[in-house]
């Protein structure tokens, strides 16, 4: 889920709704007792553990940060410090599109999902799933 991955990519503490780890669609009341239906959907525990590991990356705590909205409801965000950067691409409506990134061409592990990300000719192919990868920072 792109919004959840984007929340984990932000600086500061990540806040989840009660039941979000079980794909609950019911929004709980903030002021009344409202039990979570723990059988409401698929378990997202592994995804949240992977995002939690990503959240502990030093660049998320110590780096500078920039986010921008692209066409097609895609958010692109970058944390950087020194010669390294962490780039995130989040398609909040599942849009598929090529996205220009300031990263050297190559293959990188997707820290927000499974598999690898390929940067080719300065672009990544957004398939609608969240992308987060670490690369050398390009000189400007």
Positions of predicted regions on the chain:
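Conserved, mostly hydrophobic/aromatic
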Residues: 7, 19, 51, 87, ...
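Generic hydrophobic alpha-helical scaffold/packing signal
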Residues: 1-8, 49-52, 75
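Aromatic/acidic polysaccharide-binding cleft in carbohydrate-active enzymes
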Residues: 1-42
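Carbohydrate-binding surface patches
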Residues: 68-104
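Solvent-exposed beta-hairpin/edge-strand motifs
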Residues: 102-114
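Short, solvent-exposed loop/turn segments at secondary-structure junctions
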Residues: 14, 21-25, 73, 92-95, ...
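Aromatic- and carboxylate-lined catalytic core of secreted/periplasmic carbohydrate-active enzymes
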Residues: 27-30, 34-72
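C-terminal beta-strand-rich structural cap/linker in extracellular carbohydrate-active enzymes
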Residues: 118-140
């Amino acid at each position: 889920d792109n919004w959840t991955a984007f929340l984990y990519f932000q600086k500061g503490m990540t806040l989840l709704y009660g039941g979000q780890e079980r794909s609950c669609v019911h929004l709980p009341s903030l002021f009344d007792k409202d039990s979570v239906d723990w059988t409401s959907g698929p378990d997202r525990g592994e995804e949240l553990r992977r995002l939690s590991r990503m959240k502990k990356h030093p660049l998320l705590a110590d780096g500078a940060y920039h986010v921008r909205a692209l066409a097609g409801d895609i958010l692109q965000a970058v944390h950087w410090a020194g010669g390294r950067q962490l780039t995130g691409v989040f398609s909040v409506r599942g849009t598929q599109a090529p996205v220009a990134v300031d990263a050297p061409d190559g293959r990188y592990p997707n820290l927000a999902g499974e598999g690898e990300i390929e940067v080719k000719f300065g672009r990544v192919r957004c398939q609608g799933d969240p992308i987060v990868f670490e690369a050398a920072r390009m000189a400007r």
